[in-house]
């Protein structure tokens, strides 16, 4: 069992039951999945960009991402339907908890001028989104071997009904909120 998974069962669940007064353990919000998404608009001109991004995401997530394709053509962006324009990977279970552990304890402290993550990036239904400006904050990425700095979006999906519940859940996982 992953370290954060054990931590969730032993510390987070009892803490949230006490805070929100849940009657059942199954009511306690939990993280269902973490989605990592890289939008690659520059892939239209250079096909190697997709390969490099897929390689980076594979190292970060520990599993192979799926290449996302354009759903419809947009002439203004010179995109045709079916063009590869991004890569995404969905983590669940053990891999999800291990990624969360690495993200909170190793990657976030490596961000330059880091003052904490925004406490306002919830969507109203208990899900949290965070944007990372450069992939080199992850220790798996070798700075000398990357071709370009790329950002990615990390979407954390929870079973929480409200943003307050989701924020309490993530805060109990030692998420460094600034507000």
From Swiss-Prot:
GO terms for cellular component: ribonucleoprotein complex; ribosome. Keywords: Ribonucleoprotein, Ribosomal protein, RNA-binding, rRNA-binding, tRNA-binding. The keyword rRNA processing does not apply. One of its GO terms (biological process) is translation. One of its GO terms (molecular function) is tRNA binding. Pfam families: Ribosomal_L5 (PF00281), Ribosomal_L5_C (PF00673). NCBIfam families: PRK00010.1 (NF000585). Belongs to the universal ribosomal protein uL5 family. This is one of the proteins that bind and probably mediate the attachment of the 5S RNA into the large ribosomal subunit, where it forms part of the central protuberance. In the 70S ribosome it contacts protein S13 of the 30S subunit (bridge B1b), connecting the 2 subunits; this bridge is implicated in subunit movement. Contacts the P site tRNA; the 5S rRNA and some of its associated proteins might help stabilize positioning of ribosome-bound tRNAs. Part of the 50S ribosomal subunit; part of the 5S rRNA/L5/L18/L25 subcomplex. Contacts the 5S rRNA and the P site tRNA. Forms a bridge to the 30S subunit in the 70S ribosome. This is Large ribosomal subunit protein uL5. It comes from Burkholderia vietnamiensis (strain G4 / LMG 22486). The lineage of its organism: Bacteria, Pseudomonadati, Pseudomonadota, Betaproteobacteria, Burkholderiales.
């Amino acid at each position: 069992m992953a370290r954060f998974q054990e931590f969730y069962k032993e510390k987070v669940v009892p803490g949230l039951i006490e805070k929100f007064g849940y009657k059942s353990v199954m009511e306690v919000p939990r993280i269902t999945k973490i989605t990592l998404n890289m939008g690659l608009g520059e892939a239209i001109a250079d096909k190697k960009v997709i390969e490099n991004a897929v390689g980076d995401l594979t190292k970060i997530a520990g599993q192979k991402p799926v290449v996302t394709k354009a759903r419809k053509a947009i002439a203004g962006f010179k995109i045709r339907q079916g063009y590869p324009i991004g890569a995404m990977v969905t983590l669940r279970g053990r891999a999800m908890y291990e990624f969360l552990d690495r993200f909170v304890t190793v990657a976030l402290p490596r961000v330059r001028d880091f003052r904490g993550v925004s406490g306002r990036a919830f969507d109203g239904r208990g899900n949290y989104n965070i944007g990372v400006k450069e992939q080199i904050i992850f220790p798996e990425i070798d700075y000398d071997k990357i071709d370009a700095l790329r950002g990615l979006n990390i979407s954390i999906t929870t079973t929480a009904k409200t943003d307050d519940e989701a924020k309490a859940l993530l805060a109990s996982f030692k998420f460094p909120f600034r507000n």
